Amino acid sequence: MAPPRNVVKIAVQMSDAIPQLIQLDQAKPLATVLKEVCDAWSLTHPEHYALQFADGHRKYITENNRLEIKNGSILCLSTAPDLKAQQLLGRLQNTSREGCCEVLRNLVLLASDMTFAQEVISRDGLQKLSTIIENGDDLGEMLALGLRAFLELMEHGVVSWETLSISFVRKVISYVNMNLMDASVQPLALRLLESVTLSSPALGQLVKSEVPLDRLLVHLQVMNHQLQTKAMALLTALLQGASPTERKEMLDHLWKKNLRQFIYKNIIHSATPMGDEMAHHLYVLQALTLGLLEPRMRTPLDPYSQEQRDQLQALRQAAFEPEGESLGTGLSADRRRSLCVREFRKLGFSNSNPAQDLERVPPGLLALDNMLYFSRHAPSAYSRFVLENSSREDKHECPFARSSIQLTALLCELLRVGEPCSETAQDFSPMFFSQDHSFHELFCVAIQLLNKTWKEMRATQEDFDKVMQVVREQLARTLALKPTSLELFRTKVNALTYGEVLRLRQTERLHQEGTLAPPILELREKLKPELMGLIRQQRLLRLCEGMLFRKISSRRRQDKLWFCCLSPNHKVLQYGDVEEGAKPPTLESLPEQLPVADIRALLMGKDCPHVREKGSGKQNKDLYELAFSISYDHGEEEAYLNFIAPSKRDFYLWTDGLSALLGSTMGSELTRLDLEQLLTMETKLRLLELENVPIPEQPPPVPPPPTNFNFCYDYSITEP
């Protein structure tokens, strides 16, 4: 007879004792279960004991999480969390240095458990740890363990970072600024200051004023991957918390100190693979640097500004020899004005007053900056562009000014200038760190590409929008390749000619047109079920392989990893925390289990509980696109297992796999593309024998019925 549903078979261990195999009734109070376990081992005072999971992070079992115990779980009997916290904190003050280190190791091991952390915090554990950190009697292992334990406790969000004292923060700052310091201490101190900066504006100002940027640059130059990452994390946190003016001053100082060159040579091109956290911080640094262009992008040209009028005149004079100077100064004001209007027209401005062209925002004054940069840093290319087009047949000239304005707006859109930083994105461009003034240099390449494409298309003024569409495709495709230098970008984008773009479009069109004939459509419909089954099988295999996901803390920072996979029999999801840099764990080592039968539904995007209350700003768009959750039965309540996919592809693979597991439709864009690719391949294989045979749009006509249905059978014929 099968046991009741609320009864699970488990094992309970204790050191120096024979394990117990028991049937745990989940309806029975946990105190009663503990008493029965203690009685079996003749232990008194069951209130001094608690149950923990034997594997993973040894989480304490409470009434809130006891439903996580599944059939086959292995538990261990240990000291109750309140008593354990009291014992450890008592020993922390009354033991030698070696004893304190041992206590701190235990605190670090147990602090990730919320139940234990609350007991430590309620007994002024944070205050005791802060005393160890502030005293700084030992600048080695003991201090590192104290910082780690303090961080683990604070990560639970029970205590606000804003409650930290100024003296404590200053002491941690001193560890960052100290020259001779244990290598394990400074990454932890930097991590703590990053959390303080992101969570408390007031304390963030203290960190900004007392941690010199040059000190962070020193940490970045140390060939220690963890130290580099945490230094970059604090640097981007300080930049995000600064005002626009302060941010510009800070970035100018960093560039003067050759930070860009160091990142390009020693981080991007390092022999050690770049971690996800460093990639995110480089993305943030790139976004903040490009964000300095936003004020110019949002500001229209002021026709009453003498400086801006002089810049326009300098742009004109760089392209044309001032006719008034070559012929003397005898030109009247009207004649000189007429010459200026004509030359501005040759430059490609649509209006007689060029200020009217630059009133559009975006790109505003940023377009003028780009044109001036091109004229000053590539004067021969600039003169050739303008003079070549001013001498072309009417309507075939490529308007430089109009093209520059449109192209600047396009580059701002492709590079997301002025958009808030995503909290999960990692898609920085290595090319950005290979060149000073990368945006303006990119414009110089793009404007010459536009002129080249214009000539290849033999375009007229009426074709301007078509040319811009082709240039957009050329730039977007090349940027997606993430070239590591501007020269490599130039080579790749120039290789993507208008003819190549046409070829790609034609290929795509032929692929589409080849599947529109009714007989082909009918064949595709017959093939779909089999191919969908193949895709379903592949998605489930990806779930069985498992994947590393990042946890998002209360401050939305991704700093911890966990692993999840599907069992080979497709009946259980197994998961658990893993350390950074560790190999993916085996199925047997994962402590947590979620039976597929307990899953209620799959939630995606804004429906997920871990992103539902984060607002609707642009900075959350990427997070919504990568978030999904599983709702499952947790006793009488509904619980959630929350995920943030590393990439859009992984999001599609996992949501498809979970949908297939639950018997739902796999409706992702990736499934549609995979199905289309498989259908195309299978259809071509089926039609190989029909090469050069035209397939009719309609099936052959059905012949008319006979005049009558009076059939005759000759019985004289002997059947064999």
Swiss-Prot record:
UniProt KW keywords: Apoptosis, Cytoplasm, Phagocytosis, SH3-binding
PH domain ranges (all copies): 542-664
Locus of motif SH3-binding: 696-706
Xref: InterPro entries: ARM-like, ARM-type_fold, ELMO_ARM, ELMO_dom, ELMO_domain-containing, PH-like_dom_sf, PH_domain
Main location: cytoplasm
Residues annotated as domain ELMO: 307-479
Assigned GO CC terms: cytoplasm
Keyword presence, S-adenosyl-L-methionine: no
Tagged with keyword Transferase: no
Subcellular location: Cytoplasm
Gene Ontology biological process: apoptotic process; phagocytosis
Molecular-function GO term, any one: SH3 domain binding
SUBUNIT field: Probably interacts directly with the SH3-domain of DOCK1 via its SH3-binding site. Part of a complex with DOCK1 and RAC1. Interacts with ADGRB3.
Protein function: Involved in cytoskeletal rearrangements required for phagocytosis of apoptotic cells and cell motility. Acts in association with DOCK1 and CRK. Was initially proposed to be required in complex with DOCK1 to activate Rac Rho small GTPases. May enhance the guanine nucleotide exchange factor (GEF) activity of DOCK1.
Name of the protein described by the UniProt record: Engulfment and cell motility protein 3
Gene responsible for this protein: Elmo3
